[in-house]
C-alpha cells in the first residue's frame, strides 16, 4: 500500500481546508488514526488509513455537511430558494448546509428521534421535523409541498430501498444528491471486518449498480458519481451520486 503525508491526506479528504490548518491540528494533538495519535505533519502512513479529528474543524452540526458541500460544488447544484427533502437527516449536517446555501424550506426525515441539532429543530419557519418517519412510506399526505431538491445520507439501508418514495415527490427540474455506501449495498460476502468494504472492485460494482438503477427510473438522468471527500465510519469509502428529474 502506498504511503502519503498525513497533512496532505487531511486536505484531500476534505477534513481541513489547507495543509497549514492540518499541520496546526496535528501539532495540537487532534488528529488520530484508529490506534494512535499523529504527532508529525510530515509523517507518511498508508493512504487508506482512517483519520479522525478529535475537535470540530467545520461549521456544520455534523461532519456530514462536508460531504454535501463537496457534492454541491462538484455537480454545480444549488438549493437556493428551493423546497428540499433530507432523507436520513440524523443530526442534520445536510439540512444545515441546505439552509446555509439558501434553501427556502427543508423537510428533515429520519426513522429515529431526538437526533436533529437544536439550532435546526428550533428553526420552525424553515425546517419541518419528521421524526420516527419511515422514508419508504413518504407521500403527499406527509409532505404536501412539491420537492425541488432531495439529499440523502442514510445508513443501514440501501438507496434502492430508501429513495423511491421520496423521488416520487420530486417535481420536473428537481435534483438529488445521495451518498452511496457500499457496506449497505454489497452482499455480505463483500463486507469485511467491522463492516468495512475495502475492495475497489466492489466499490466500482456498487456504484455501477446504483447508476444503472437510478438511470432506469422514469424521468431521471444521472449527472455523475464522485468519491466523498471524507470516509465514513471505520474508514468506509463513500460516493456521491447526483441526478436530475427531467420529466
Which residue ranges define each predicted feature?
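Conserved SAM-binding loop of SAM-dependent methyltransferases across substrates and taxa
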Residues: 91-103
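Short, glycine-/aromatic-enriched active-site segment of Class I SAM-dependent methyltransferases
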Residues: 182-199
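S-adenosyl-L-methionine
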Residues: 107-157, 161
